[in-house]
Amino acid sequence: MPKRYTKEQKEVLEVEQDGWWVYVLLLSTIVILAHSLKDYTFYVENLSLTYSIFILPVVYFVTNYITKKYGYAKSVIGIAMSGLLLVLFALVMSFVIGRNFSFYDISGEFCGYVVSQFVNLTIYQFLLVNTTGSFILTFLTYMFAFVVYYLFYTLLYMNLLVFDNYWVSYFSTLILQGMLCLLLTFFDVHIKKGLEI
């Protein structure tokens, strides 16, 4: 038997259902911020790490929030739009700063972003439908998305070039992102499912 809502509840539900595009814009903005910060680094001992490692977990968190509240289809739209805006931003900025645009420069990041987002989205949707919000499984979904992202980024952008300290910086990045993901997973597990799920 379908739920019956009062007039006020229906108005709130309509506003909530129409608000998904704001989160898609937020996702696009965070993706562009992560792209902008990828060239800025900080050093931990002899390791050079980029500031975007702190932004990337938030990207997956926002995508998972869209999935949980508004459904799989809205997340696919969000991933497509943010990926397209990432390429457009790189194109516009290359002309603004007077450099030639090279798709090669953004291909690793773009492919890593899109593939890891769809892997994350597929696993997360499976967890939403078939489990009751497991903390460990949600955390592992985030971590697996990072592994896929760095795999494609390394494969396409760096041509599998592995420097002397590559693995140390790789695992350091995953550990730092994992610590941030513990907090985000705590919030993620406590978000209520939306109407589309």
Enumerate the language-model features and the residues they cover:
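A residue-identity detector for tryptophan
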Residues: 20-21, 167
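Structural signal for membrane-spanning alpha-helices in multi-pass inner-membrane proteins
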Residues: 31-39, 89-97, 153, 157, ...
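Alpha-helical membrane segments and adjacent membrane-interface helices in multi-pass membrane proteins
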Residues: 13-15, 22-27, 37-109, 113-114
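Generic hydrophobic segment detector
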Residues: 1-5, 64-84, 115-133, 188-189
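Membrane-embedded alpha-helical hairpins and interfacial helices in multi-pass inner-membrane proteins
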Residues: 106-197
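Short hydrophobic/aromatic segments of transmembrane alpha-helices and their interfaces
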Residues: 5-6, 57-59, 160
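Short, Lys/Arg-rich, polar N-terminal cytosolic tail immediately upstream
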Residues: 1-17
